[in-house]
A protein has these predicted regions:
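Bacterial N-terminal signal peptides
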Residues: 1-8
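Divalent metal-binding segments
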Residues: 11, 18-28, 33, 37-287, ...
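Accessory "access/gating" subregions that flank catalytic or transport cores
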Residues: 293-296
Length: 313
């Protein structure tokens, strides 16, 4: 399958009347799926200055050829319009680059050993964060703080589940967050507890924020690096636009994206949706209006809000 990233898709008339714009690149002999009712399939595409100026047949595409035009023979391969992902957490790539990776481990022991190894490799760390544990590894119970306390008990450990809806923490993280047996469940969240009522070490949904809000956020530069990494992946897989769901560290993420836009380092469109926690309610509206007004660039736009009202199964 052959994919191309295009910034604008349109159809040019097949008429040869008038002067044609000269293309930088022309693709011919392809199976081009256009997603247009009047012409769902084509065999040629012409591009000039990063924009698609013609979609149609091989013969008419020749009218856009100049002395320096590059012609690429697709040899029957498929070409698709750019993909749009309407719900993702691209900034979460920072978790992939800068924290303990638990994905792929098959047992509790493997999880714990990865945390222990990270602690040994980062002797100056003030916190250990990680991502990727699966609820399926704990079929009869939730992750417990005791397993983490056995390897790291002097600094907080906070490990996100693979779906980002649960947080596994050690006793130090609970202590710093002030979570005790008397702490009530926050609206929209659950503090799981042992039989004696003490927090067990698993926080579900909005209860995660009780610990996450006490941890240092990724820096603007770390988010810039993470977004570069994400864009590289997106480009290779044919994505031209994404909708970010921003939950925590919104300011740093916005600063990273706007800085990259000013540096002309963005290669896809980024639409931003800001999450609102149940406890925030209408107090968040002025902030959302401000972001909508400020974020109206060519490649970065603030145009949505996410109301968090449920959980996952």
């Amino acid at each position: 399958m052959f994919m191309i990233i295009g910034l604008q898709v349109g159809f040019s008339s097949n008429s040869e009347e008038g002067k044609k714009e000269i293309a930088d690149t022309i693709f011919v002999n392809g199976k081009v799926y256009t997603v247009e009712k009047q012409q769902p399939w084509a065999e040629a595409v012409a591009i000039s200055n990063g924009k698609i100026i013609y979609v149609g047949n091989n013969t008419c595409a020749k009218a856009y050829k100049g002395n320096k035009t590059k012609v690429i023979d697709l040899k029957g391969k498929m070409m698709l319009p750019g993909f749009i992902d309407n719900h993702l957490h691209a900034s979460g790539t920072a978790n992939l680059l800068f924290t303990v990776q638990l994905k792929g481990a098959q047992t509790l022991e493997e999880y714990v050993q990865r945390v222990k190894a990270y602690d040994e490799q980062h002797p100056g760390a003030t916190v250990i964060q990680g991502h990727g544990w699966s609820n399926t590894i704990f079929p009869s119970a939730s992750p417990n703080k005791a397993a983490l306390d056995a390897v790291v008990n002097d600094i907080p450990v906070a490990l996100r589940s693979e779906d980002f809806h649960s947080l596994w923490v050690n006793s130090k993280a609970l202590e710093i967050a002030g979570i005790t047996k008397d702490t009530p469940n926050p609206e929209g969240g659950v503090i799981e507890r042992n039989q004696d009522g003490e927090p067990s070490g698993t926080l579900r949904e909005t209860a995660q924020n009780l610990v996450l809000n006490t941890l240092p956020s990724f820096s603007v530069n770390e988010y810039k690096e993470a977004l570069h990494y994400f864009q590289s992946f997106a480009n290779k897989n044919g994505y031209t636009q994404v909708k970010h769901i921003l939950v925590e560290n919104q300011e740093n993420i916005v600063q990273a994206l706007t800085a990259l836009e000013k540096e002309q380092a963005l290669t896809i469109r980024h639409n931003l949706t800001f999450a609102i926690q149940p406890s925030e309610g209408e107090s968040r509206i002025p902030y959302l209006k401000e972001q909508r007004n400020n974020l109206q660039g060519q490649l970065v736009k603030g145009n949505g809000a996410k109301l968090f009202m449920d959980g996952v199964m």
